[in-house]
């Protein structure tokens, strides 16, 4: 009798991706974040679907519909806070996943890496548009400030901004289209995830040593399915704790004030996961320069494979590069902190220093350090 798992056209695909997939035997917990991102995406789509059943994308009723969800819908408060804090968990896993890729040299799988960068941009766009939907003060002013950045594009900027707004300011048309795109994008993200996995399974997984592991592979199931499930439990426990004990910890109190175009909040800032990029944007006094720096702060990931000068793939056996990597992490934490501070002394100069360091470490120090390490190893 033939095994349906290996013969059925649909089941065969799942089998080759999750059951009989050969995986390196040395994968550490840093390889858990891919599957955790899958769980985050599933949670977000599911909770988002239920929220969309009760939400109305109209400036007159959007804020009240969110209040209605929290007060009157059965477990609406739970669904809403799972969705809001689920986004935070999504970005924690995303940044750790990208960091893992940088540390262990996974970016040498260039197709997988490039699809990953597109995924990062798509998830960021989705999160930004989702933040606008509750139509609180920070929703409205965040949308106004961030979309207004496009006016820095020469010649077409102003027309482009008005085209996105659907008028001369952020208003009903903007909210409606943001809701439409916020609903659509996660499904595009899901399709991109499939492409990401397709490219990954063409090459097989990297491992902590960065050395080809073709001679030492184990089946994905049961070894890594069990390991992934432990990751799911830990993450869902952390998310549940956040949602049930302090659901507003990562949010902004200003968003509990209905949007008012006549009253600007004292400090306009995005959610915590965009603060590092926001700090880089603010550290350049010129508008166009700031916008370019903002885009390049993420797009710089695309040239990391070209800057790989080391003879070794992973940083596991490269202590100098490790020091630089953790310095980069410290710089990113500093930028995140600065992004949430007012634009005044000493925060301005700290932000500018950290922004310069961020680009210098990636573009100059890391490639040079790799060359020095090659020389020390007499390669």
From Swiss-Prot:
It is a multi-pass membrane protein. One of its GO terms (biological process) is mitochondrial electron transport, ubiquinol to cytochrome c. Heme b b566 binds at residues 97, 196. Its main location: mitochondrion. It comes from the Eukaryota. GO terms for cellular component: mitochondrial inner membrane; respiratory chain complex III. The chain crosses the membrane at residues 33-53, 77-98, 113-133, 178-198, 226-246, 288-308, 320-340, 347-367. Heme b b562 binds at residues 83, 182. Its cofactor is heme b. One of its GO terms (molecular function) is metal ion binding. It is found in: Mitochondrion inner membrane. A ubiquinone binds at residue 201. Keywords: Electron transport, Heme, Iron, Membrane, Metal-binding, Mitochondrion, Mitochondrion inner membrane, Respiratory chain, Transmembrane, Transmembrane helix, Transport, Ubiquinone. Binds 2 heme b groups non-covalently. The cytochrome bc1 complex contains 11 subunits: 3 respiratory subunits (MT-CYB, CYC1 and UQCRFS1), 2 core proteins (UQCRC1 and UQCRC2) and 6 low-molecular weight proteins (UQCRH/QCR6, UQCRB/QCR7, UQCRQ/QCR8, UQCR10/QCR9, UQCR11/QCR10 and a cleavage product of UQCRFS1). This cytochrome bc1 complex then forms a dimer. Heme 1 (or BL or b562) is low-potential and absorbs at about 562 nm, and heme 2 (or BH or b566) is high-potential and absorbs at about 566 nm. Component of the ubiquinol-cytochrome c reductase complex (complex III or cytochrome b-c1 complex) that is part of the mitochondrial respiratory chain. The b-c1 complex mediates electron transfer from ubiquinol to cytochrome c. Contributes to the generation of a proton gradient across the mitochondrial membrane that is then used for ATP synthesis. Belongs to the cytochrome b family. This is Cytochrome b.
């Amino acid at each position: 009798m033939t095994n349906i798992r290996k013969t059925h056209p649909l089941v065969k695909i799942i089998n080759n991706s999750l059951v009989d997939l050969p995986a390196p035997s040395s994968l550490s917990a840093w390889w858990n974040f891919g599957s955790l991102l899958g769980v985050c995406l599933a949670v977000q789509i599911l909770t988002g679907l239920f929220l969309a059943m009760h939400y109305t994308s109209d400036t007159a009723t959007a804020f009240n519909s969110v209040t209605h969800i929290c007060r009157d819908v059965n477990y609406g408060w739970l669904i809403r806070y799972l969705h809001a804090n689920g986004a935070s968990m999504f970005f924690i896993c995303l940044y750790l996943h990208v960091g893992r890729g940088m540390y262990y040299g996974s970016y040498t799988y260039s197709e997988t890496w490039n699809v990953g960068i597109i995924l990062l941009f798509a998830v960021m766009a989705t999160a930004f548009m989702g933040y606008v939907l509750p139509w609180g003060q920070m929703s409205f002013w965040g949308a106004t400030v961030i979309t207004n950045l496009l006016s820095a594009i020469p010649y077409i900027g102003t027309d482009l901004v008005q085209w996105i707004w659907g008028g001369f300011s952020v208003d009903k048309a903007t909210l409606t289209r943001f809701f439409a795109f916020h609903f659509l994008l996660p499904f595009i993200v899901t399709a991109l995830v499939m492409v990401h996995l397709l490219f990954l399974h063409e090459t097989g997984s990297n491992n902590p040593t960065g050395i080809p592991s073709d001679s030492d592979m184990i089946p994905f199931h049961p070894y890594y399915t069990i390991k992934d499930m432990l990751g799911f439990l830990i993450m869902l426990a952390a998310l549940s704790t956040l949602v049930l004990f302090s659901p507003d910890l990562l949010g902004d109190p200003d968003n509990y004030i209905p949007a008012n175009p006549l009253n600007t909040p004292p400090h306009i800032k995005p959610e915590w996961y965009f603060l590092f990029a926001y700090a880089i944007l603010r550290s350049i006094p010129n508008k166009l320069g700031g916008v370019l720096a903002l885009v390049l702060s993420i797009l710089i990931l695309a040239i990391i494979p070209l800057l790989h000068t080391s003879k070794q793939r992973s940083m596991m056996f490269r202590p100098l590069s490790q020091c630089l990597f953790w310095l980069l992490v410290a710089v990113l934490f500093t930028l995140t902190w600065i992004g949430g501070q007012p634009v005044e002394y000493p925060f301005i100069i700290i932000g500018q220093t950290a922004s310069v360091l961020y680009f210098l470490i990636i573009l100059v120090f890391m490639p040079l350090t790799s060359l020095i390490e090659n020389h020390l190893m007499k390669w």
